[in-house]
Amino acid sequence: GKNCTEEEVRTAIEQGTLMNYLQQVPVKKDDLFFIKAGTIHAIGAGALVAEIQESSNLTYRLYDYDRVGKDGKKRELHVDKALEVANLSSSAEPRQPLRVLKYRKGVASELLTRCKYFEVYRMLVNTERRQTVHYHADEVAFRVLLCVNGCGTISFEGGNITFYKGDCVFVPADSEVLSIHGQVQFLDVRG
């Protein structure tokens, strides 16, 4: 995007030209973007995302492409509130490069991004039928495992959970050591 003033954004919204101020970034499978809070952003058609964010129950809709809700009316915009917290200065492309992973005993892990609220790791597990990988939970915060490819099984004292692409597993804080096996790629979100 480019630097702009609050008034320029308001005018662009009224005239339907807000997209002229935004930086368009083509996306491809496995891309990672870290978008800081307050950054005006949109997700283009056809993109499937895993959106991990700081704990907040607020989303301000600044522009909505004139879409309508189930009631047939345009959805509510929150222009004033959004502009109070928006960062209107230009920024470099938020794409983060993925690094090459090295496998060790059936698992590879890399830190994808980190901020003061969370860390996101990419983990690849590739085990044979009788081989497992041990997973240690955090002592003070729960973790989220989001399966983004393949399938696997998590074993714990109380049983097993089989998970597939799109499934999410919450691991309570101070959990026992878990065993994971299968051929699976997941995001390990640590709060």
Where on the chain are the PLM-derived regions?
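Active-site region of the double-stranded beta-helix
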Residues: 1-29, 39, 43-151, 155-157, ...
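Generic detector of intrinsically disordered, low-complexity, polar/charged segments
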Residues: 35, 147-149, 179
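Residues on the solvent-exposed faces and adjacent turns
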Residues: 127, 173, 182
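Low-complexity, intrinsically disordered Gly/Pro/Thr-rich segments
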Residues: 163-177
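Short, basic/aromatic-enriched C-terminal tail that caps enzymatic domains
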Residues: 177-191
